[in-house]
């Protein structure tokens, strides 16, 4: 049976619908950086997703099986979001978003395996995949919650997370390298907006 990160690490991918505190360890990802409104038709965000998935499936379907290889389900899309000059995120200013789109990598994928996948995808697709990065990141202490509903309704969930964190003796901590983080568990093309499942995670620190 294929290894499914969502099922094996439910604490990180299926938190309750009420806020909780969690410590997230270091992980490796495929990543593409960009800026602008993610809803823009044929915009940078949608192009980034195309590149991410192309490389993710190149790795999964590769005939080359590196040391430590195991069959797995490609993990869900994730995103880091911020805006210059704003502490947190302002959902009314989508054009100002800076973002990093992510797909988690299995532990057996080294930088060498990543480089091979970029080369293979570029040759097969006749496309430049150089914007895709090997991204290592340790998220650390966070507050998180499962948000169910449209993305534009997220501020209500985010406010509840901030209130919970404060009540537990924590403060939000959008410092260098710490961002608003979302994990997308639903296919937006097939799921009604009111049923979309999104893990929302924000960095905190003890006060």
Please place each PLM-identified region on the residue numbering:
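A solvent-exposed interaction/effector surface
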Residues: 1-207
